[in-house]
């Protein structure tokens, strides 16, 4: 019988060398993300978002990345959800992309800021109608008595707003402004490659790269 202790993979697809990576972590992330897309991975834009609540307890969940540029990594959610309350109490977060088919991880840590009203409005308007209605119908993370209650709210919102529901005031974007980004490539015998970009205003282009022991 197979036990958990027997479950393992010996990674061997690729290596990660300092000479081969971009000096800027956003450029390196773009390179890896394009390779994930080219490999046709299922939802390569999924990431784990870790937060810490007012009581000091961590929590994590899967969310979708919706924008990346030199300012940071953007996702959208309900500001009154558990993650929203966590980020109001402690405006720092960690992200993790895990692309098992490529034997890669990207870890990101940084402070949180809300996106502008215009950014949130533009993205909300681009969502499918059902998702826009759902943003009104769901009081995310709140206890409800039944699925029927949620569906009744959905119907009421659809009847109220029709084809053009506005963005709810409690719904919008966050940007993780990173001060550290780690790229991890699986290697044989668990001797993985780990390159850490750390923000450094004195360095060009504003980041230093360090190799970490696996």
UniProtKB/Swiss-Prot annotation:
PROSITE patterns: PYRIDOX_OXIDASE. The keyword Acetylation does not apply. Substrate binds at residues 8-11, 66, 123, 127, 131, 190-192. The keyword Cytoplasm does not apply. Binds 1 FMN per subunit. Pathway: Cofactor metabolism; pyridoxal 5'-phosphate salvage; pyridoxal 5'-phosphate from pyridoxamine 5'-phosphate: step 1/1; Cofactor metabolism; pyridoxal 5'-phosphate salvage; pyridoxal 5'-phosphate from pyridoxine 5'-phosphate: step 1/1. FMN binds at residues 61-66, 76-77, 82-83, 105, 140-141, 184, 194. One of its GO terms (molecular function) is pyridoxamine phosphate oxidase activity. Catalyzes the oxidation of either pyridoxine 5'-phosphate (PNP) or pyridoxamine 5'-phosphate (PMP) into pyridoxal 5'-phosphate (PLP). Homodimer. This is Pyridoxine/pyridoxamine 5'-phosphate oxidase. It comes from Burkholderia ambifaria (strain MC40-6). The lineage of its organism: Bacteria, Pseudomonadati, Pseudomonadota, Betaproteobacteria, Burkholderiales. The gene is pdxH.
């Amino acid at each position: 019988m197979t036990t958990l202790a027997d479950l393992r993979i010996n990674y061997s697809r690729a290596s990660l060398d300092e000479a081969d990576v971009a000096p800027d972590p956003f450029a390196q992330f773009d390179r890896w993300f394009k390779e994930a897309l080219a490999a046709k991975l299922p939802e390569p834009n999924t990431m784990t978002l870790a937060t810490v609540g007012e009581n000091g307890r961590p929590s994590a969940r899967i969310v979708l990345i919706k924008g990346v540029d030199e300012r940071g990594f953007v996702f959208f959610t309900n500001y009154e959800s558990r993650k929203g309350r966590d980020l109001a109490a402690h405006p720092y977060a960690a992200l993790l992309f895990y692309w098992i088919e490529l034997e890669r991880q990207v870890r990101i840590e940084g402070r949180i800021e809300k996106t502008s009203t215009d950014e949130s409005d533009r993205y909300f308007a681009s969502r499918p109608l059902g998702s826009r209605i759902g943003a009104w119908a769901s009081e995310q993370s709140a206890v409800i008595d039944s699925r029927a209650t949620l569906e009744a709210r959905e119907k009421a919102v659809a009847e109220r707003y029709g084809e053009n529901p506005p963005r709810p005031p409690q719904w919008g974007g966050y940007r993780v402004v990173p001060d550290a980004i780690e790229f991890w490539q699986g290697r044989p015998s668990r001797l993985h490659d780990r390159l850490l970009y750390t923000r450094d205003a004195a360095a060009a282009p504003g980041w230093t790269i360090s190799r970490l022991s696996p």
